[in-house]
């Protein structure tokens, strides 16, 4: 316990560095400290603290806030940040797998996967700039964003990594109607279904309308849904998503609903 306290003090002193490093020409991809990420059942919050050389992942009970377990791992890792509004992710729908990532921008990108029951640790290392996107409900497939160009002309592909076979699947995850073109835009906000199967991400673009990227993490399929909204990019950045019980995905600007997507048919209704 004494060792844990010493490491926590050192990690708290370094908190925030990962987010700062991730902003150097690329997307914000990890969070250390802060709110961490909550398990799908709402009973545990996972918070990563790093000294730079080591990372401590605290398992915090909810409600109450007591640290009841922790996992130490070598290296600099954080909870994945998947959108500019600060949305975090990284827990599979069944709650068994927690994903952490190194900041993007290095020669390689590493991902650490912790089994939340056995505490077993696995690592995935890929050359180039990558970030976490999603994980299948059973924790068998990791979805990653492979960046081709950073900066104002940010471009990327979504790729799938089979964790059982420990290999990156050759074909990108794309909308079949669009083909294997590079995606462009900035992820603004995300909503995920309660079972962890569908991840809906709203992207802003500089000279085009915003769009929703709908990722089916079970069938390894994606759909790009253009939103008929005449908004400049700063206004697109203020949009938020809300999932209704009737499976409608609302696009909101402040308190107003400006569009809605029927997630069963992918038809967009402008308000």
Task: Show which residues each predicted segment covers.
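Short glycine/acidic-enriched loop and turn motifs that connect beta-strands
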Residues: 50-54, 103-107, 147-153, 204-209, ...
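Repeated scaffold domains used in trafficking and secretory/extracellular systems
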Residues: 30-40, 75-91, 127-138, 177-192, ...
């Amino acid at each position: 316990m004494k060792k844990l306290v010493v490491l926590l003090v050192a990690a708290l002193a370094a908190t925030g560095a990962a987010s700062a490093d991730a902003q150097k020409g690329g997307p914000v991809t990890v969070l250390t400290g802060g709110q961490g990420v909550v398990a799908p059942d709402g009973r545990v919050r996972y918070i990563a603290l790093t000294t730079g050389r080591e990372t401590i992942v605290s398992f915090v009970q909810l409600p109450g806030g007591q640290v009841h377990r922790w996992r130490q791992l070598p290296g600099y890792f954080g909870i994945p940040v998947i959108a500019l509004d600060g949305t975090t992710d990284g827990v599979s729908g069944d709650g068994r797998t927690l994903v952490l990532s190194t900041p993007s921008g290095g020669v390689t990108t590493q991902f650490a996967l912790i089994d939340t029951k056995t505490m077993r640790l696995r690592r995935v290392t890929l050359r180039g700039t990558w970030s976490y996107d999603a994980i299948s409900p059973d924790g068998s497939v990791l979805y990653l964003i492979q960046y081709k160009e950073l900066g104002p002309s940010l471009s990327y592909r979504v790729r799938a990594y089979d964790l059982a076979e420990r290999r990156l699947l050759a074909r990108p995850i794309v909308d079949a109607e669009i083909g294997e073109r590079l995606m462009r835009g900035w992820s603004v906000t995300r909503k995920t279904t309660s079972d962890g199967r569908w991840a809906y991400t709203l992207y802003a673009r500089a000279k085009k309308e915003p769009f929703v990227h709908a990722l089916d993490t079970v069938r390894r399929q994606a759909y790009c849904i253009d939103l008929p909204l005449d908004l400049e990019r700063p206004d697109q950045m203020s949009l938020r998503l809300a999932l209704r019980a009737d499976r409608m995905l609302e696009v909101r600007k402040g308190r107003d609903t400006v569009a809605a997507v029927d997630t069963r048919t992918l038809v967009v209704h402008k308000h």
